[in-house]
Amino acid sequence: LKAHKKGLMQQLFPAEGETVPRLRFPEFRGAGEWREKKAGTLFKNRKEKGKAGLPIYSVTMNDGLVKRSSLDRKIDDIAKPEGNRKAYRNEIAYNMMRMWQGAFGIVPEDCMVSPAYVILSPQDGVHSNFFGYLLKLPRSLQFLTSHSRGLTSDRLRLYYDDFAAISLRCPAFSEQQRIADCFSSIDNLITAQIQKLTTLKAHKKGLMQ
């Protein structure tokens, strides 16, 4: 499934130098070229102080945004709200120091995040989940790296103003949603397979004992 997803991502997004993907859903085959837009017109940087009672989330490299309390870190989860930033559902939060490696996630619910994160608020016609997949593409990570500032790789930071200057090619909202739904379905299947495998391994271990 992971190999299938990787292959689809190469087909459903335009290759470098192209304006349409090689594979397109039937209802969008006559929809024309994907338009190139500056990231700053797609997402605005929203800064709002945290609010008491909201869960605190952290950005991870592989799993996007997860509740901080679920991580194996000894961090006080009852932090002062004003010391964090509020993020709204379906926004994107990214770690400035690790965005070039793909350290970002879609906000699953209204929550608080570290003030060190940049919060991207989607504008009209922007489907966050679509861009969640788009920004994970190898060439997108290359753009994010080239726009990050720092003398060495361990000091690279992607500030919002630099992110805003990046050009991203995207289709109309309806096609964004169709592509995002496709990949979300595959991700759900992958998660279900992993959970099933974990259960079977535990069952096997129990039988061996």
Model-predicted regions and their roles:
Residues V59-R73:
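Short, basic/aromatic beta-hairpin or loop at an interaction surface
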Residues S70-L71, P81-L141, T145-S148, D154, ...:
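A short beta-sheet element
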Residues I75-P81, T152, S185:
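Short, solvent-exposed loop/turn positions at domain surfaces
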Residues R24-K51:
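Non-catalytic DNA-recognition/assembly elements of restriction-modification systems
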